[in-house]
Amino acid sequence: MLPLTHGAPLARPLQLISIMQIKKQLITLGLSALLAQGILPASLSAQQTKTEKVPGISLSDMDRKVRPQDNFYRYSNGGWIRKNPLKPAYSRFGTFDILRDTATSQIRHIVEELIAKPQTKGTNDYRVAVLYKQSLDSAERNRQGYKPLIPELQALQGIQTKEDLLKHIAQQDQVYGQGCLFGTGVAADEKNSTMNIFLFTQTSLGLGSRDYYVESTPEAKQILAGYEAYLVRILKLSGYSDAEASRIAKATIRIETELAQFSYSNTELRDSQKNYNIVTIADFARDNKGFDWSGYLRLRGLDVATANFMQLNFFKAFDKWYSSAKVEDLRDFLTGHTISGAANSLSDDFVQAHFDFFGKQLSGRKEMHPRWRRSVDVVQNVLGEALGEVYVKRYFSPEAKERMIELVHNLQKALSQRVEALSWMSPETKKRAQEKLSSFVIKIGYPDKWMDYSALDIDESKTYYQNLEAATRFMQADNLKDLGKPVDRTKWLMSPQEVNAYYMPTTNEICFPAGILQPPFFNMDADDAVNYGAIGVVIGHEMTHGFDDEGSNFDKDGNMNNWWTPEDRKKFEATTQRLAKQFSAVTVAPGLKANGELTLGENIADQGGLTIAYLALQMANEGKQVAKIDGFTPAQRFYIAYARLWGQNITEAEIRRLTKLDPHSLGLLRVNQALKNIDPFYKAFNIRPTDKMYIAPKDRVVVW
């Protein structure tokens, strides 16, 4: 039941693969070599007393042959795109990936320092060293093959009745949280956000999106065929005969397809109100008798009287479906999922099989990342904050944190001014919006309180697989211990070294880890236009999430509570629907259009970030004579800096995959489509009606 996941509240990340599911996916992303080659920006090290000037915008990254009025994305990024063809190990490579590679190399340097000397058992340094060395030890993992799975597979073979099945599901879910049939966890009650409650969430399908199972397109059929071939491959590696492997693979896909029919779509999962359904266990069990809900919780040893059945209609349909499902089919389904979930933790032939489907076919990658990189990622998934504590001491300065606090406050002022200027919003709603804005909890760099790993039993006497299981148990136990207790608002959902940012509605907090606070996002030595166009828009983006189609359902205290007048809400929703339709009209690949409903929240946040960051820049430059740099005005540098954040090369397979499941628009759309709605952009680059970047004023949509 690996990889490692555990329950967590909904968060709104800036760029990364969605954390919209109830589980928080641990989405973490040699230093000496980088320093020797002069690749690492000097301003990254907190140990330096003086930093060299780093240009805010590299002219060679641009393509000046392209008119900004026709394709601003290409104008700003064309040079970089040409110089950086897609690397074989990537399905998408851009600015975020460069910074993640840098952070990963920094973490590698930290880890390799630890393994070079003896460590005291029971310390975080020891845990890091053991896990990293075992992850690197392919010879031992290859020697073991699928042996680590044998106890689990034998337990599955022993299932003969629904009672046996219930015991197995309860046992596995107590350890892993996100089970094969449905997920569970502990998170804040969205209508009483100071307290934690138990919740159920729908199944996490093997392919990530229900579209693959419910669509009858040639693409979907091809993906399902590849998925079946992958399952057969890993089942045969696990000792099953050709006939057994074929039967189990077909049963796995058949059951996933049945579950997909009543699973919520990725767009529906964004609907906060639709995904909040508090029900007593007694009432739900009385009305839904196909699955023994009370017995399930009892077998897990959990005292739960009330829970949030997040996707309530899924669970009602699931209960009915389960009552008629055959034990042998469910056993086969669990077998397929158990092996697939463990594949990356087993021998190289399993890892290769997993990559050949999920990496190559589904995403278009050509090769795996090197083993050291994969091993660093494993350690970060398990011990992210332990590594982060070392990381921030080396690579994040107090001056950077102070400057970020200043920028955040400037953006708050700009958003406050913007709210007051909205012509469509009533004074009553404006007052409550201002209250929410002034109540933002701001987290920058790293947490004040670090995670306690003392209960994590990682030991060199155990196998790699056993240590990963111990880590999974630790994280699941860490989540479950919060049941019925007050929410710990000091916790972070990301490690400090992550190149990302998020907004959390139930705590009304915005968080900017140290990893993203480096060039080109944040540069202590660059001019204001570049910083406001980059990290300023990021700050504004996260702030605007508090007021997007989801965040706007939560009040200043983090509770799902309507603070709008009916008329204002109606105007807001009408405007956001115009934005959704605008993005949905854009073709992203042959025969495929963007999903403006799925990406609505992120598109609102992008446009809000652009609007208020530019206003903040104007406020910062008020009364100043600001000269051009490299021939560009501050306004032009602002928009170029923003566009540079999203420059990337990407495979068509990844475009198609992300369009199905990612609530973020593709980089091209985050530049060209977003900027078409921003009036100051037209003035900055003299956009005229005959230009391709032009849309008529009546068709432009800006919510905030």
What do these predicted regions represent?
Residues 49-50, 282, 287-290, 308-315, ...:
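Intrinsically disordered, low-complexity linker/terminal regions across diverse proteins
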Residues 6-7, 18-33, 37-38:
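Bacterial N-terminal signal peptides that target proteins for export
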Residues 61-82, 213, 217-237, 600, ...:
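Hydrophobic/aromatic-rich, well-ordered segments within soluble, folded domains that form packed cores
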Residues 50, 67-70, 75-136, 140:
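Active-site-surrounding "flap" and adjacent substrate/cofactor-binding loops of secreted or lumenal enzymes
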Residues 113-406, 410:
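Noncatalytic, helix-rich "gating/capping" subdomain that lines the substrate-entry/channel surface
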Residues 48-60:
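Short, Gly/Pro- and small/polar-rich lid/capping loops
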Residues 41-47:
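Boundary at the C-terminal end of the N-terminal hydrophobic targeting segment
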Residues 8, 12-13:
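Short, low-complexity intrinsically disordered segments enriched in A/P/G/S/L with frequent Arg
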